[in-house]
């Protein structure tokens, strides 16, 4: 094992010990959101640290067995050689497991998704191909036990879909389909083609993780400047005699809120904080919408035939994924929703790239 990998694992083991101590603290246990976050982090570390402990134990057995090779007892030396072979085999397996466990996880992998299919180059034929792709993804979702819901549909003039959006709900939806984003090209003879010529059309697919609802906003008191001032307007004589009004400036965002409706400074502060939370939450939600829009634009491209990740060639019964140079002569099976034959190699290639980066 490389020193850099061992160092990373030792750091993670220390972090797990820190989490164990934190989760035992009463103030953490009473803060539900923080407790949940730390518990999730602990659960993510557990399989990694468990595997690392097994690796260390196997390494210890290997070292002890090698020491026994110097023993004068020949039977003990034979036994030591057997234990060395077993320990080396186990270490090799655990090393592979650790590398896989250390791969950076995509925080969106567990999310539900929105699938968008948009007809690109090819007019009516592209709209019909969009319908074929939709059927393929719906059948794949059905095979995996996912729930689907049509969110929006713009039908083609002569059948198919100009654009259609589907919400897919189920475990691993994003992790399995995230590599489907891009241009999908079809080569076939349209039904309206009397000369039997092959036409090329294209659709774009975008896979977008569904945004989670924003939890209650956490506000750092250090980010606040609180000013008091004498209230004006309605409220009787009392409002003009004390500095009961509150103005709160959120330094990080520049948002300013104030409240002078109540006679009590405490109540005005509570109302102002409530308004600040609402404004910050609204700002976060607007930011999420903007990010989703940007993601969608980056994924769907222009719909031009040149921006392609995959080609479906009907005359040859062929599907080619150009990113990994994978060609399968299983067009009918794939269009029936048997997508694992393409998705599994894509996932494997992605993991191989991550492992290569991890080993650098």
Swiss-Prot record:
Modifications the protein undergoes after translation, according to the UniProt entry: Methylated by PrmC. Methylation increases the termination efficiency of RF1.
Chief location: cytoplasm
Locations listed in the record: Cytoplasm
Keywords: Cytoplasm, Methylation, Protein biosynthesis
Protein's UniProt keywords contain Protein biosynthesis: yes
One CC-aspect GO term: cytoplasm
Keyword Hydrolase on entry: no
N5-methylglutamine: residues carrying this PTM: 237
GO molecular function per UniProt: translation release factor activity, codon specific
InterPro entries: PCRF (IPR005139), Pep_chain_release_fac_I (IPR000352), Pep_chain_release_fac_I_sf (IPR045853), Prokaryotic/Mito_RF (IPR050057), RF-1 (IPR004373)
PANTHER family, per database record: LD18447P
Family recorded in the similarity comment: Belongs to the prokaryotic/mitochondrial release factor family.
This protein's name: Peptide chain release factor 1
UniProt gene name: prfA
